[in-house]
Amino acid sequence: MPKPRLTIIIFFLLIFSACTSQNSPAIELSPTPVSTLRAQPTGDSVKVGVLAIRSAAAANAQYGGIIAYIEEQIGQPVTLVPLTQEDQFSLMESGGIDFTFNNPLAGIQVQRTFNTEILVTLARNNTGPTFSGLIIVNKNSGITSIEDLKGKNGTCVNQQTAAAGCIFQVHHLQQKGVDPFTDFNSFTETPSQDNIVLGVLNGSFDVGFIRTGQLERMLRENTILTLDDFLILDQAEDDFFFPHSTALYPEWPFAAHPDTDPELVNQVRKTLLEMPEDHPALTEINSTGFVEPLDYSAMHELIESLQLKSWDAQ
């Protein structure tokens, strides 16, 4: 009597197993929405270091579309590597990145140190391939001129490698007879330009150094409520789209590590130069695309005259 019962049990187990194995592939092949599909390129990952002037998350949100476009065009995986002011040098030295995209001052400092090749220059809506720096104070601070900055508390992004977040303004003020390093009561570093603006607004700092377009972007994002809370010192009288204090300088360069494969370098250069002006990834960074490299000799002059990082590089 036990044998027939065992036979029946085994029979049903075999049927259940067969049904289960037949149903499994159907689960794996369930449809995926078209919007989430993405081609998977082959080959080693290409690493693009992007200077994160706000945060790593913001860098990924802003420039992720550019990276995805490069990946699509060259047929290889491309990884965005957010860079601090410090590791844009250390990762270049270690070979941890194949390309860099950073501010022009740091870009030229990296070039002087590691012999990178500048491929293109970023161009932005309304301003093209140039930008500038602002010297901002709280409108209610009582500060109305550069001379009033003596004895005050100032801040900038980085005193060695930040372009429109520091060095453009330092040079401008020194040319006007005010040295932030000796004439300010304090001159500190604040890595985030958002925090510089907010610090000036709430009185933590008397004066802050930021790039053109920073105030307008924060206004669009409702991080600040009005531009009327700020005064721009020594505002230039020209037809540049944004108000600014300093001279105009070339925008961010996109450069290649000297050991990056030449064929890949040419592919990336061509990809960026031919990127459609209306591509959503460019809209995300307020850009119209990339142009042939501008003349960065002004960066060399700043580096050497102020003896900044790489000033003595051979």
Language-model features: locations:
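Bacterial signal peptide processing site
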Residues: 20-23
